[in-house]
């Protein structure tokens, strides 16, 4: 039985004080959650949020990282720096990183391997555009992403990967894939993992849905056979909203 994982991606929002305030409000609201609870603040808030979550059931993720250990990479953060801070997860390959910063699947794969080398669990994002969805190439496109993104891992690493399926057309648009569409695509993703690493590994991989997830949509999504959680955007910025999703 896969344990659900619900992560709040705060994107480029919240000062340090605002981030800590949300965490303090969130802690009592999610203390009895049956799923893994993760918040993903900006780099500048990571340390303060990590300290604020101490002793709680809330885990902390970075929103990105470089794959190199150190060096002349101005503006970047290394996996070793995150590990030293005690960060448990890192979001990799988000569609905004792919679109605005030209991240490739090959670079994402290097980051996935670097995360595991530093005891950080990657949350690997994939998803299609509306044009791809309407052209009927969703499954092929996402398979191409996943086959590169999580290539070359050990079986022990592969089963720990969290995959987030985020249809790009549903991010921040208010549109959402139907629960059937989401489950069908996530099942297709799981079948790609079967091809790569076998059924035993694929059955352990947790696959989230992301894309305008709200408290009023989460229950029906989580009732589906293959949806193991959510990567939440805007609705994770307020403790009340996010706890409503976590406590589905």
UniProtKB/Swiss-Prot annotation:
Q: Which Gene3D superfamilies match?
A: Aldolase class I
Q: Which GO terms describe its biological process?
A: gluconeogenesis; glyceraldehyde-3-phosphate biosynthetic process; glycerol catabolic process; glycolytic process
Name the GO cellular-component terms: cytosol
Q: Could you tell me the EC number(s) of this protein?
A: 5.3.1.1
Which GO terms of the molecular function aspect are on file? triose-phosphate isomerase activity
**Where does this polypeptide localize?**
Cytoplasm
Q: Record-annotated residues binding substrate? A: 9-11, 172, 212, 233-234
The EC category is isomerase
Question: Which catalytic residues are annotated?
Answer: 94 (electrophile), 166 (proton acceptor)
Q: InterPro entries in the record, alphabetically? A: Aldolase_TIM (IPR013785), TIM_sf (IPR035990), TrioseP_Isoase_bac/euk (IPR022896), Triosephosphate_isomerase (IPR000652), Triosephosphate_isomerase_AS (IPR020861)
**Reactions that this protein is recorded to catalyse:** D-glyceraldehyde 3-phosphate = dihydroxyacetone phosphate
Pathway assignment reads: Carbohydrate biosynthesis; gluconeogenesis; Carbohydrate degradation; glycolysis; D-glyceraldehyde 3-phosphate from glycerone phosphate: step 1/1
Pfam families this protein is in? TIM
Q: Which UniProt keywords apply?
A: Cytoplasm, Gluconeogenesis, Glycolysis, Isomerase
User: What is the role of the protein in this entry?
Assistant: Involved in the gluconeogenesis. Catalyzes stereospecifically the conversion of dihydroxyacetone phosphate (DHAP) to D-glyceraldehyde-3-phosphate (G3P).
Family that this chain belongs to: Belongs to the triosephosphate isomerase family.
Quaternary data: Homodimer.
**What is the protein's given name?**
Triosephosphate isomerase
- List the source organism: Clostridium botulinum (strain Alaska E43 / Type E3)
Q: What is the lineage of its organism?
A: Bacteria, Bacillati, Bacillota, Clostridia, Eubacteriales
């Amino acid at each position: 039985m896969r344990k659900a994982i619900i992560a709040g991606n705060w994107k480029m929002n919240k000062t340090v004080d605002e981030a800590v305030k949300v965490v303090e409000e969130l802690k009592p609201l999610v203390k009895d959650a049956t799923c893994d609870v993760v918040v993903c603040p900006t780099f500048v808030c990571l340390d303060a949020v990590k300290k604020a979550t101490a002793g709680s059931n809330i885990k902390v993720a970075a929103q990105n990282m470089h794959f190199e250990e150190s060096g002349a990479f101005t503006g970047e953060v290394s996996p070793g720096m995150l590990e030293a801070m005690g960060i448990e997860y890192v979001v990799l390959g988000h569609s905004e990183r792919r679109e605005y910063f030209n991240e490739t699947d090959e670079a994402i794969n290097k980051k996935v391997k670097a995360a595991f080398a530093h005891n950080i669990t990657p949350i690997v994002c994939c998803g299609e555009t509306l044009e791809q969805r309407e052209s009927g190439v969703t499954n092929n496109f996402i398979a191409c992403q996943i086959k590169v993104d999580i290539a070359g891992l050990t079986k022990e690493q592969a089963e720990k990967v969290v995959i987030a399926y985020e249809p790009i057309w549903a991010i921040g648009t208010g549109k959402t894939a139907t629960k059937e569409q989401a489950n069908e695509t996530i099942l297709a993703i799981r079948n790609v993992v079967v091809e790569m690493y076998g059924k035993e590994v694929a059955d352990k991989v947790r696959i989230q849905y992301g894309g305008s997830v709200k408290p009023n949509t989460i229950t029906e999504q989580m009732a589906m056979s293959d949806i193991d959680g959510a990567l939440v955007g805007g609705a994770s910025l307020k403790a009340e909203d996010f706890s409503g999703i976590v406590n589905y």
